[in-house]
């Protein structure tokens, strides 16, 4: 019986350690190295392995990594524990990192108004320029700079709490590049620049891509460093069969894996303990399975506990000294310098960042300022470092400017007011002035329309703009029949001062042409107006389609045909569109939408306030109101309040309950303006798709009238 027990124990031991080098002998006081392979999201398995090593107190003397292995390995070498890295992984939205979408709250005021395109195609030298990747990696810079701030002053990676190296591939020569010195964030960016997903990274005079192209499993490099025992985490799953190759990423992965499979076999000769987690059904982009992947690494590492227990132990509990987060990493920035800028000067760059010199900054505050600069869309990528120069702290910015000036842009949209529309746009940057932009939209579909916008952005110094638009639309009665058809053309010239890209104040003059037709009697009417106006605008909403926080304000005072009327005849209007978004919980947001419009001596039907319809375009004095047809009711004055309770689930899905109340009235002479004459309830199901919003709404007036079913697809234009 005893012999049988020994036999089965030995058999289990052999089965468990088939990934352990044959005849492995552990010398006295061995040096232990950790080799972490690349594999995108599969690299989260490394974290599970690190947690096991930490729980046993294993002393690691050197770390090498490629791609995601470089990211995890770099964090570990910098003093983070396995649990620390697990927390980082679980709290990071990797899809958001890859999307590299601008933070809308920081986007320039002009760009917020033209945020409506699905496809953007740069034109250079008369030719279409295809993007080199999905993302430039700008958000990766923010994240890595923040994570590695405690070792940002260490240029020699052998001086880190655990010596470290990472592998990248020189894009021009195809040769392996081993990074052991320099900016650790930049080196890791180069090692993880997966082709087609992220732009190549320029360091010095060379450009680099993912190290997996040459050595994905850098075990041999550790042996060359004198490491006795190399513990490796192998993420290679071999080549896929045709039934598993279903996307561009799958095809690219398969091609890259041709070389990885061969090189990994070579690296196994230098790996003493090869930990190979079970990653069946998981791939480089399985970021939503990070918990499962992390657990697979932890489970696999537990099989090697008996061997790990024979290895040297740490004589300390932590590698990083705990730091008070309130006072940590605060730098006095005395000056700034910019490298590689040929189009935009230092003053423009510092101004857009709103950087005051000298001032105290953290890596987090610098990241936020760079986000403002990046949101101008004038730069492909912006890197930075804090350096010492003449006993001063200097913020060194290295920029890669977007030299493209011409763009073609396209969009699609459907709503119940303007029906279907295909948007084609031409955008020209730096026309006459470096800080200028011209945008020309043509909408082709059921209701053709055009928009022209030219603006010189001088920040808080007033800039000049020209705007023009033209459109046609039908007004409907409560029986859903069109009773009027309008053509409206507007041309504006204005000056505008912008503060922090959140507020704009200015004034101008507009020229309106109206052509209206009564579809019942056939009567036609045409009027023209020259109107001076002033305005105050604000926009800090985090999303145009499904905002969760921030506000929107548009307050305008306009005098109609001011230059043609006597003082007694002059007509004025004051209107305010005010919206606020207030997060109640992580998933629930209260959204307030209010509109106030007042008329003095108004005599034109074209400038009355019209209530009804679901739309978000700027259409004269038409006001959105659920449960009523577009332009169903009108009068000289209006008060409306919309209350939305927006519930967000499964990241991009929404359910919105709405209660709207309002009033239209002729004057303020009696108490009628305090009455609620219009009210409705509505329910919306929405999806924030890569192609814009998808909304299905059912709204019902609280009066005795039929409900209205509406569909909205795509960005508003």
Regions inferred by a protein language model and the residue ranges of each:
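Bacterial Sec-dependent N-terminal signal peptides
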Residues: 1-25
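Patatin-like phospholipase
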Residues: 19-66, 74-371, 375-387, 393, ...
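Acidic/histidine-enriched alpha-helical segments
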Residues: 240, 309-324, 509, 550-553, ...
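Gram-negative/organellar outer-membrane beta-barrel architecture
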Residues: 364, 369, 383-543, 614-623, ...
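C-terminal outer-membrane beta-barrel translocator/porin domains of Gram-negative envelope proteins
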Residues: 410-412, 532-537, 541-650
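Short glycine-rich beta-strand segments
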Residues: 469-473, 510-514, 556-562, 597-601, ...
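C-terminal hydrophobic structural anchor segments
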Residues: 646-678
């Amino acid at each position: 019986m005893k012999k049988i027990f020994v036999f089965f124990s030995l058999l289990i031991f052999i089965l468990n350690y088939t990934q352990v080098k044959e005849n492995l002998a552990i010398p006295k006081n061995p040096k232990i190295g950790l080799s972490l392979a690349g594999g995108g999201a599969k690299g989260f398995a490394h974290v599970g392995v690190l947690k096991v090593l930490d729980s046993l107190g294993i002393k690691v003397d050197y770390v090498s990594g490629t791609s995601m292995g470089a990211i995890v390995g770099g964090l570990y070498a910098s003093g983070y524990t396995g649990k620390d890295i697990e927390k980082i992984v679980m709290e990071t939205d990797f899809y958001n990192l890859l999307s590299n979408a601008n933070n809308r709250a920081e986007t320039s005021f002009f760009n917020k108004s033209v945020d409506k395109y699905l496809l953007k195609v740069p034109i250079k030298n008369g030719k279409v320029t295809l993007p080199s990747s999905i993302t430039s990696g700008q958000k990766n810079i923010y994240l890595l700079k923040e994570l590695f701030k405690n070792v940002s002053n260490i240029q020699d990676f052998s001086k880190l709490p655990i010596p470290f190296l990472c592998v990248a591939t020189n894009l021009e020569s195809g040769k392996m590049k081993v990074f052991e010195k320099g900016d650790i964030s930049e080196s890791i960016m180069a090692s993880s620049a997966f082709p087609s997903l992220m732009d190549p990274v320029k360091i010095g005079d060379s450009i680099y891509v993912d190290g997996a192209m040459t050595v994905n499993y850098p075990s041999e490099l550790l042996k060359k460093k004198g490491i006795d025992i190399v513990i490796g985490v192998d993420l290679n799953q071999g080549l896929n069969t045709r039934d598993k190759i279903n996307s561009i990423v799958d095809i690219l992965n398969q091609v890259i894996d041709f070389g990885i499979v061969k090189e990994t076999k070579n690296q196994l000769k230098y790996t003493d303990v090869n930990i190979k987690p079970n990653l069946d059904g998981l791939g480089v982009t399985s970021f939503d399975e990070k918990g499962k992947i992390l657990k697979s690494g932890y489970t696999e590492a537990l099989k090697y506990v008996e061997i790990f227990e024979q290895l040297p132990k740490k004589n300390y509990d932590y590698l990083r000294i705990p730091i008070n987060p309130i006072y940590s990493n605060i730098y006095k920035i005395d000056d700034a310098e910019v490298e590689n800028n040929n189009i935009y000067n230092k003053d423009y760059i510092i101004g857009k960042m709103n950087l005051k010199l000298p001032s105290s900054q953290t890596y987090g505050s610098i990241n936020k300022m760079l986000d403002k600069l990046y949101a101008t869309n004038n730069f492909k990528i912006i890197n930075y470092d804090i350096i010492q120069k003449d006993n001063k702290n200097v913020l060194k910015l290295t920029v890669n400017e977007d030299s493209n000036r011409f763009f073609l842009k396209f969009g699609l949209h459907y709503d119940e007011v303007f029906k279907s529309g295909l948007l084609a746009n031409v955008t020209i940057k730096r026309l006459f002035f470096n800080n200028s932009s011209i945008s020309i939209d043509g909408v082709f579909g059921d209701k053709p329309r055009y928009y022209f916008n030219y603006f010189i952005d001088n920040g808080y110094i007033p800039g000049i703009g020209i705007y023009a638009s033209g459109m046609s639309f039908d007004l409907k009665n409560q029986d859903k029949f069109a009773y009027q058809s309008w053509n409206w053309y507007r041309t504006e010239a204005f000056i505008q001062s912008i503060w922090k890209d959140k507020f704009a104040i200015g004034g101008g003059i507009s020229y309106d042409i109206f052509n209206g037709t009564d579809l019942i009697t056939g009567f036609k009417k045409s009027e023209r107006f020259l109107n001076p106006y002033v305005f105050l605008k604000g926009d800090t909403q985090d999303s145009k389609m499904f905002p969760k926080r921030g506000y929107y304000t548009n307050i305008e005072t306009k005098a109609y045909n001011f230059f043609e009327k006597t003082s007694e005849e002059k007509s004025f209007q004051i209107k305010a569109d005010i919206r606020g978004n207030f997060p109640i919980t992580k998933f629930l947001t209260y959204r307030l939408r209010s509109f106030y419009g007042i008329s003095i001596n108004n005599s034109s039907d074209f400038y009355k306030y019209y209530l009804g319809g679901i739309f978000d375009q700027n259409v004269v004095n038409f006001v959105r109101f659920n449960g009523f047809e577009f332009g169903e009711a009108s009068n000289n004055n209006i008060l409306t309040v919309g209350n939305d309770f927006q519930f967000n689930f499964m990241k991009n899905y929404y359910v919105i309950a709405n209660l709207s109340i309002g009033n239209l009235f002729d004057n303020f002479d009696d108490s009628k303006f305090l009455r609620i004459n219009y009210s409705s309830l509505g329910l919306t199901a929405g999806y924030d798709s890569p192609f814009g919003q998808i909304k299905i709404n059912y709204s019902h007036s609280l009066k005795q009238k039929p409900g209205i079913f509406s569909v909205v697809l795509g960005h508003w234009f």
